[in-house]
């Protein structure tokens, strides 16, 4: 395993303030490295790179599902394990990207090796979550939905089922990606959530909420660096 510190994707200050930021990634990673990387705040991205950041995870022993998600799940058919990127998945993915207004689209094939948690409503696929087993833990990489049934809060239903499947598989933690910006505030309401400070896993939700709110006050990376898109 090799760590790389990329200062072409960072920024710094030294005239009136001291600041140095750069991207930290792990390469040449072996399967035996995955547990260490996850437990030390790294997340694997669609390129197969492991990036250090403000990771989040759920302690499955402390997780409690909500009554609302449980009730709404009874109106759905939920399957787990199919890893075929078929036309239905592509349709949901394209609808998801359009709904979110993303400037970029992560290649759907990046998730071809993942298990899928699928949610059907009235026989139609409405959402997919891409997940993987990593030793004694599970990782949830991406949730997508066509948002045609917003009344069913499929994101909440999926999150509940992810945790229940993780519990059934004997997982200690479910890793759920980074925790940046106000779009991730919902994570702070999950029972058992922990976040990576850079040195330890913390349960201080007040601090995490403050950090997320601060993230959303920053200019985007293109405005900050001018070359971060490369």
Model feature map: region roles:
Residues 36, 87-90, 195:
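Generic detection of intrinsically disordered/low-complexity segments and helix-coil linkers/edges
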Residues 47-62, 176-230:
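Active-site/acyl-donor-binding loops of N-acyltransferases
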Residues 1-77:
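Acyl-donor-binding surface of acyltransferase catalytic domains
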Residues 37, 93, 187:
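Conserved active-site tyrosine of GNAT-family acetyltransferases
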Residues 40-41, 96, 100, 190-194, ...:
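Alpha-helix boundary/capping residues
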Residues 2-6, 16-28, 32-34, 113, ...:
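Acyl-donor binding region in acyl/amide transferases
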